[in-house]
């Protein structure tokens, strides 16, 4: 018969890799087509004019210009791209 208790296995020791979510371009920043504006899980922010949404809900620029965040009724936040000539007015 064994006189030494067997060592228990740890139930910790796991950790997931970081996903680097969040806003990548803030309001007023200049973007070119294809730039990622927001990486998110679900539709925290919605695409507006000049912004597309990927299958993982990533928002990206479809055209160049300045980023603008608009708060609409219902609590939705829309991300728009304003062209540079319009932004100067």
Swiss-Prot record:
Family: Belongs to the bacterial ribosomal protein bL27 family.
Protein known as: Large ribosomal subunit protein bL27
Membrane-spanning segments: none
ATP-binding in keyword set: no
The UniProt record lists the keyword Ribosomal protein: yes
Native source organism of the sequence: Hyphomonas neptunium (strain ATCC 15444)
Domain of life where this protein originates: Bacteria
Pfam families for the chain: Ribosomal_L27
GO cellular component annotations of the record: cytosolic large ribosomal subunit
Single biological process term from Gene Ontology: translation
Keywords associated with the record: Ribonucleoprotein, Ribosomal protein
Annotated InterPro entries: Ribosomal_bL27, Ribosomal_bL27_CS
Residue span of region Disordered: 1-21
